[in-house]
Each structure stands twice: as structure tokens, then as C-alpha cells.
Curated annotation (Swiss-Prot):
Organism: Neurospora crassa (strain ATCC 24698 / 74-OR23-1A / CBS 708.71 / DSM 1257 / FGSC 987)
Full protein name: Cupin-domain-containing oxidoreductase srdB
A Pfam family per the record: Cupin_2
Record bears the keyword Chaperone: no
Function field: Cupin-domain-containing oxidoreductase; part of the gene cluster that mediates the biosynthesis of sordarial, a salicylic aldehyde structurally related to the phytotoxin pyriculol. The most interesting aspect of this pathway is formation of an aromatic product from the highly reducing polyketide synthase srdA. SrdA synthesizes a reduced polyketide chain from one molecule of acetyl-CoA and five molecules of malonyl-CoA. The polyketide chain is then reductively released as an aldehyde.
Domain Cupin type-2 span(s) in chain numbering: 92-156
Molecular function via GO: oxidoreductase activity
Organism placement in taxonomy: Eukaryota, Fungi, Dikarya, Ascomycota, Pezizomycotina
UniProt enzyme class: oxidoreductase
Keywords per UniProt: Oxidoreductase
């Protein structure tokens, strides 16, 4: 990990605090906004290299909306990804921030909202993503880097659970490296791939 300056809260300096608008239905069945706020479970990550904001989470897929079951689930801080569920996580990266190479065993759909981010795969292949660009990560080892040494970058990730991933007859392992320090309290961080 490298960074030219710590982030002390979400949002990162220079980025706006996003609103989320959650819809639902009133007692008569009319479509209404049931919640308007700035997200839940904000946290500074990795000593200020990044900060996250949980935009939405649900403990099932298909998602149970009846009786606001999903909104009740979302009151608790979710893990990195949710078995049989979904997590939508916004991450601000400090200028120059570079993650370690890692793999979360989930479908990670990442959209660049602000700045420019380099995505490097375990093979060494690289792509530069700009605002509006989307990465569909299907369990690949990868690394993120904010290409600017002056401005923060922001990405929005939708993380969906997957079935065990078999490549060349071998089941791939969860491997977050030092990023697991942010998620070590969760079962998926147990074992030899837990933070060192």
C-alpha cells in the first residue's frame, strides 16, 4: 500500500458526500422514498489510504423486500461480501493509493465515479478506468491504484456471492492479503489467507 496523504473520514477531501435515496411503498401501495441519507457504516481503511461507505446490503438473493427485511439487515455492518446476498460499497482512494494484489470470492462490479484508477490483474495485464468505466471482476486476483498523486478517486462496488470457483480443476482460494485487516472479524478471513 502506498499513499501520499491520509484520508481521515468519508468522503475524502475534495469529493462530495453522496446521497442515497431508498424507495419502497406506503400502506396504500404507493411508491415513496422511505429513506434519504448519506449511507451507513462509514470507516477509514488501511490507516487512511482509503475510506468506505456502505450504500446498501441485503442478506439474501433474491432480496426480501417485503416488510423491509432488507433494510433491517442493513442496520448491521456487512462483511466484505455477504454469502447469498449483496453488498454495495463506495470506496474513496487517497492520492497515490495502491492496494495489494487480492481476490475476494465474489462477483465484484466496480464503477469509477471520480478520478482515474488503474486495474492490474494477477497476470500483469493492466487497464486504466475513467469515470463511467466498469470492471466486472469474476474472482480474478487484482490490484487497484489511484493514478493521481494529487486528487482522490472514488469507486462504487456491487459485490455478489458466487458458487465455488474452479479453474483448471482447482478451487480458487479467498486471498485478501493485508486488506483482510479491514475484514478480519468475519469468517471469510479465517485460515491461512487471513491478514498477516
Amino acid at each position: 500500500m502506498s499513499t501520499s496523504g491520509p484520508i481521515t473520514e468519508f468522503p475524502a477531501p475534495g469529493l462530495r458526500d453522496p446521497f442515497r435515496y431508498i424507495t419502497g411503498h406506503d400502506a396504500e401501495g404507493n411508491a415513496v422514498f422511505v429513506q434519504t441519507d448519506n449511507g451507513d457504516h462509514r470507516a477509514v481503511m488501511l490507516g487512511g489510504a482509503a475510506a468506505q461507505n456502505i450504500i446498501y446490503s441485503a442478506g439474501s438473493n433474491p432480496i426480501e423486500l417485503t416488510g423491509n427485511v432488507d433494510l433491517e439487515f442493513a442496520k448491521n455492518r456487512p462483511s466484505l461480501h455477504i454469502p447469498n446476498g449483496v453488498c454495495v460499497r463506495m470506496i474513496d482512494f487517497a492520492p497515490g493509493c495502491k492496494s495489494n494484489m487480492h481476490r475476494a470470492l465474489c462477483m465484484g462490479i466496480g464503477t469509477v465515479c471520480e478520478g482515474e484508477v488503474e486495474l492490474t490483474l494477477g497476470s500483469g495485464e493492466k487497464r486504466i478506468l475513467r469515470p463511467g468505466d466498469v470492471s466486472i471482476n469474476r474472482g480474478a486476483m487484482h490490484q487497484w491504484r489511484n493514478t493521481s498523486d494529487e486528487k482522490p478517486a472514488r469507486m462504487l462496488y456491487t459485490l455478489l456471492d458466487i458458487k465455488p470457483l474452479i479453474v483448471n480443476g482447482k478451487q480458487l482460494d479467498f486471498d485478501m492479503g493485508y486488506l483482510m485487516k479491514e475484514y478480519a472479524e468475519y469468517d471469510e478471513g479465517e485460515g491461512d489467507k487471513k491478514a498477516e
